[in-house]
Amino acid sequence: MLPFAEAPRSVCILRLSAIGDACHIVPVLRTMQQVWPATRFTWIIAKTESRLMRLIEGVEFIIVDKRAGLGAVAAVRRQLAGHTFDALLHMQVALRASLIALQVSAAVKVGFDRARARELQWLFTNAHIAARSREHVLDSFFGFPAALGIKERLLRWDIPLPHAAQEYARALVPDAQPTLLISPCSSHVQRNWRPERYAAVAEHAVRRHGMRVILSGGPSLLEQATGAAIVRAARVPLMNQIGRDTLPELLALLARAAVLLSPDSGPVHMATMVGTPVLGLYGATNPARSGPYLSQQWCVNAYGEAARRFRHREPEELPWTTKIETPGVMDLIQVEEVIAKLDELLRSRP
């Protein structure tokens, strides 16, 4: 059954969310497109993530509104009526995604190996990727084309950006002055750093390096409050764009920034897509698993200390997916460490 002896006619990718994981799908998709240029690709994706990913050419998108609950499953069934695929790549271990996988007609349904097929994912597939342990999420995703017979790995994240998004970014970053983009919030509050610490780094970036500093983020009340707190605490001018951009506009802005400062969040992986180095703040999560794929050396990594302090174990002793989302965990990251890492990063740039 696998690997395929020849290029399949059609492949369906099932990965709904989140934005960072969707970013990891892109090089996997680009690799398959290059190796199998005649293959038809369909991606079942959540509504929010589709706002960026649907810009990828040559892919059919089936968009899922997760707020619709079981109604979303029925909607996918209707959209897929008459579709048959040579393979389904079931790349999400949530039960919601597995219910959607049931609606896909495919000869081969590839899931994770048994050890990683949480939430009974193995019941919804008839093939699996090779068993591996303690690897980055992106590397685990490359196990799927490998199972189909593709040995190549193309680290290509290119997404064509609309002219309007590029103009938005150019208006904010119109010249060669280096820009520090701060995206201060993650999807989980315990991954977030204190506003006054972001402000201290912003002050250093402006005074020591002459940087422009822009805050970015979504429209949630927490993000808006965090942005306002950073602006109040900083004794230098900042541009607060939190809640004011779309995903394509954010990607265009990241492309014009010199550095992104952020905790474990979607923008970390968006920055990787456009080649912008990421100064990642990691205490609650392990950057070796979920950090910026091309900026591991620029992460301030307090995960080991967090494991010892809050779990009383060495990080190597914890299950690979362990998150230490405990109050105070991000306080382990000191301002001085982040400033030192920023200085080192900027010295390394041409």
Model-found features: residue ranges?
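Catalytic machinery of carbohydrate-active enzymes
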Residues: 1-350
